[in-house]
Structures are given as structure tokens and as C-alpha cells.
């Protein structure tokens, strides 16, 4: 896809949401230690699971086909059991960790924790008006607009609904 660089920002990125590198990057970040902290879900496994069609977005992490994984080369009974346990443990991570894990532009771990403390749950945040978001100390108009845009995107709304169905509901 086309590379873009938002005005005033240093980094370029692929604007295609379905770009394989974008998909892998979102899943790797989601599973990383600072985010949902899913042990055994590193870069190589993400590459393998995306290539094999086991995951296409972060919600798919919670509906893995463990029987299919067990049949794959390099996966024994113990590694599959450990992976399942790590994924199950991630269902109960805090709202701050989830918000950071979702890679919402301008929402780093500190901002994610501020939002979680202010709104308490995902439902309250999803319906929050711009003025409510901006009223949180440490959250300015750029962050508020970025968050509101992300929440208003239908793909992200569907993703949040799928995460809830999968038991991720901090």
C-alpha cells in the first residue's frame, strides 16, 4: 500500500489497514509485554499464525484453533497448553493495558492509564464526547480527537465487540 507521513510527524507508515505488515505489527504490539503480555506470542509466532490464517486481527488471538496449532511443526502439547494459558490470562488485563495494546494513535501507556482511570470501563469511554475526553487531565485536543476518530471507525467498533464476545471486557 501507499506510504504516508501525517503532517508534523516523523514516521511514515503504510496506509493500507489490511497490509500484512500492518496486521503483524498490530498483533505483535497487542501481545507484547507492555500491552496484553501474552507469553509465547512473539514476532515469529505472529508471522506463522498470520501466514497460516490463524489470526487476521487482535480479536482472533482469543479464538485460536489450538488443535490446528498442536499439529504444526515445533508445537508440542506443553507449548500449546502454555500458549492457551497465556491467552486466557490476557482476557483479564486492565483497561489501561487494553487501550495501549490497541495501538490507538497518540495513546501510549501513560495516556491509556489516564483514560482508564477517568472512564473506568470501555463502555463509558466508547460513548464519551470529545469534551469529556479533553477534560481528563493530561489529555489534550490532539489525543482526544485521535481517540474519538479511532472509536468512531466501524472496524474498531466491530473489533471491540469481538473482543468483548471473546471475554476481554475490562
Where are these regions (language model features)?
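Accessory alpha-helical DNA-binding modules that contact the DNA backbone or grooves
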Residues: 1-170
